[in-house]
Amino acid sequence: MEASSSGITNGKTKVFHPEGGVDLQGYQLDMQILPDGPKSDVDFSEILNAIQEMAKDVNILFDELEAVSSPCKDDDSLLHPGNLTSTSDDASRLEAGGETVPERNKSNGLYFRDGKCRIDYILVYRKSNPQTEKREVFERNIRAEGLQMEKESSLINSDIIFVKLHAPWEVLGRYAEQMNVRMPFRRKIYYLPRRYKFMSRIDKQISRFRRWLPKKPMRLDKETLPDLEENDCYTAPFSQQRIHHFIIHNKETFFNNATRSRIVHHILQRIKYEEGKNKIGLNRLLTNGSYEAAFPLHEGSYRSKNSIRTHGAENHRHLLYECWASWGVWYKYQPLDLVRRYFGEKIGLYFAWLGWYTGMLFPAAFIGLFVFLYGVTTLDHSQVSKEVCQATDIIMCPVCDKYCPFMRLSDSCVYAKVTHLFDNGATVFFAVFMAVWATVFLEFWKRRRAVIAYDWDLIDWEEEEEEIRPQFEAKYSKKERMNPISGKPEPYQAFTDKCSRLIVSASGIFFMICVVIAAVFGIVIYRVVTVSTFAAFKWALIRNNSQVATTGTAVCINFCIIMLLNVLYEKVALLLTNLEQPRTESEWENSFTLKMFLFQFVNLNSSTFYIAFFLGRFTGHPGAYLRLINRWRLEECHPSGCLIDLCMQMGIIMVLKQTWNNFMELGYPLIQNWWTRRKVRQEHGPERKISFPQWEKDYNLQPMNAYGLFDEYLEMILQFGFTTIFVAAFPLAPLLALLNNIIEIRLDAYKFVTQWRRPLASRAKDIGIWYGILEGIGILSVITNAFVIAITSDFIPRLVYAYKYGPCAGQGEAGQKCMVGYVNASLSVFRISDFENRSEPESDGSEFSGTPLKYCRYRDYRDPPHSLVPYGYTLQFWHVLAARLAFIIVFEHLVFCIKHLISYLIPDLPKDLRDRMRREKYLIQEMMYEAELERLQKERKERKKNGKAHHNEWP
């Protein structure tokens, strides 16, 4: 049974069962269609009544379809029904009030002066610009392509000219066919096997039971945002020959505004502005300054005096603001189909990925919070913390030269407890969980992306052959070769020239990485010098917490250096990328992205790597300290360990960076737009209110970043790395990332809707090179977390002590009772008389016992001074080292095996999606066969009419 194009009536779907059971629009006709044998008894009166009711609904449907556009791709289908009145009603109402329809349309700045032709694109130039001849040729060729054009001067600056462009139906149809724009041709009809009929009845009963339950608060309000999903129609590449197969109820709204702008931009990219084979395209005119700006229009104001619930949305921008960019809907799902319709697939995919990433952070944040709370609840039962807090008789050696005093181990009680919050028995489990989480996140994102790509008609979409960058063309215009794709001659870059440029670029990257290392070295020197300064500070609070004060100030200085170097790195990455001379814009974008990510990743994480793996590891021991340039003694860890320094580094950097990024994303455009409005008020006086048309309002907004979505993706990718790479040391990182992303989604939405010009609706199948970077970060996170657990934390030393040296040695137990004596076993003894002259402290320690101290303790596994080999490594040191190396190997192999197993078990495409794709392919082929059959029948009729004989190929 073939599905007709009117398969959806009043929101109810026609469902066919292969064995013959039929559901029509919610009317139950439980009769079997038996191909053979006697017919079943049927109550024809009930069928007749059902058919009469169906006929009424069909008439209502046709009346609605005549008044409004198609519910599949109509650009106004998401607006409030109250705004979808007929044109004749609008005209009569407006004429009664003394206003005509053209005047109404003209006043909102979205149409030409006639009020009928919608503005699809805006070009801006200055009359004082000397490139007049190029513009005239370009605009003459624009008219030759069939585009309509009008010009308007600015209300505040007569030197600024706005060129309004409109694409008629004939132009849109011609280029939509060339661009393979997919349009709706048939509503979707889902075939259900007979065996699922019983389950569908159960689902209906469950849905009735759920009616009294509260609605899902995260779902968008259907009254405000009806028909959210745009996947209720099958689509096919548009063809003017098969135009009658497509669902067209209104030619003006058949192509939505984003598609119209994309088609116009496609035309502008192929129009010549000067004689010559390479003098073509709008991008080159923007580069040489002939035009100052080019952008599609926003669809009116994003604010309204009336409530959206009572009066409906005035336009899609207003609808996006109320349902997406407003802070009041921060907890609701994103209207991704509306975002895609307004901004295009590329921006829609970014917000889909960001929303998916944020949603996947919920389990990671919950488990991380659980690990932290587990540390809180087990704090009083931690044997290690108890021993540190009760060790009033253990005197620790000074942590710096001269000015640092001796201190009791019990003075580190608070730091030992804080360390236990992050370094406890659940840390290893959380590290394994996060490694698996990263894999699951990426695998399920591939499935989610596939569903989005299908719903948004991106499955079979392929990027067009890209144009050559003007810079590449100007550099290599003298050397040409034949393009194997287009068959046309094009500029060519020699292999030797390309290699030499890549070598220079790689050298520049290496040099900038050395600059980062130098900055880290400067931070290390600052920490070494400052700890002694703070130890001699006159304020007791700072003097007694000199190491914490040193770490805190060093992190803040490091953050400032990071932000300053980011500005430098952007300029260097731009210089090196231009030096490479990439051939196309996508090659340029990928090269620039890779450099910027590498620079910023190293810049952001270099100090963190130093604290995690080098701080306190190569300091020597009292009496034989290692020094920088034979002068500065390397910094030691706090008596409670180095993990607290790593936690402070990650927490401060993460909070400060996310706060700064959010301010720059929203605050900077707000300040710029406020400054623009302020200049206008100063020029025209505050008492004069000017009503700007939409094109001038949009021109005064900030243009989208020159690098597109690069900054948005980079911020989130760096956050993903910060969340996964050192998560074993900071379990609260996913929670901070989740809170930030909830704000980030609405900030980005607000910025796109209110502060930026409307970007061109670009298409993309995926998130591009960023997916490969995410996979690389996932692999790196496994390695770093293995090293953090084995090297930075005390998990392995505690485990070795419990099974080998503690009270439970040889018994196979590792509880808290087995940790008795661990603190004493992890500290070595040093004879104070063995201090070097420049390391000997000013105090002799008599304030502790009334007599000068003879011995002090330090963190290490070394022999006492009276042994055969003074201060040599003990056997326990080698056992701990072997256990650490073994843990790294076992942890990495185990987690990588789990990651690969998960990747293998999770298919990239859901099964139902594969079936839907096959169904759509079948219907498209059927449509083509029907069109071909109609053509042949038409030819046969014409031949019979003309009396010409024809040859039958098939019997």
Swiss-Prot record:
GO terms for cellular component: plasma membrane. Glycans are attached at residues 83, 105, 257, 288. One of its GO terms (molecular function) is intracellularly calcium-gated chloride channel activity. It comes from the Eukaryota. Residues 1-352, 446-505, 569-595, 737-768, 907-955 are extracellular. Signal peptide: none annotated. The chain crosses the membrane at residues 353-373, 425-445, 506-526, 548-568, 596-616, 716-736, 769-789, 886-906. Residues 72-100 are annotated as: Disordered. Keywords: Cell membrane, Glycoprotein, Lipid transport, Membrane, Transmembrane, Transmembrane helix, Transport. The keyword tRNA processing does not apply. It is a multi-pass membrane protein. Residues 374-424, 527-547, 617-715, 790-885 are cytoplasmic. It is found in: Cell membrane. It holds the Pfam family Anoctamin. GO terms for biological process: calcium activated galactosylceramide scrambling; calcium activated phosphatidylcholine scrambling; calcium activated phosphatidylserine scrambling; chloride transmembrane transport; establishment of localization in cell; monoatomic ion transmembrane transport. Its main location: membrane. It catalyses: a 1,2-diacyl-sn-glycero-3-phospho-L-serine(in) = a 1,2-diacyl-sn-glycero-3-phospho-L-serine(out); a beta-D-galactosyl-(1<->1')-N-acylsphing-4-enine(out) = a beta-D-galactosyl-(1<->1')-N-acylsphing-4-enine(in); a 1,2-diacyl-sn-glycero-3-phosphocholine(in) = a 1,2-diacyl-sn-glycero-3-phosphocholine(out). The keyword Transmembrane applies. Coiled coil: none annotated. Belongs to the anoctamin family. The term 'anoctamin' was coined because these channels are anion selective and have eight (OCT) transmembrane segments. There is some dissatisfaction in the field with the Ano nomenclature because it is not certain that all the members of this family are anion channels or have the 8-transmembrane topology. Has calcium-dependent phospholipid scramblase activity; scrambles phosphatidylserine, phosphatidylcholine and galactosylceramide. Does not exhibit calcium-activated chloride channel (CaCC) activity. This is Anoctamin-4. The gene is ANO4.
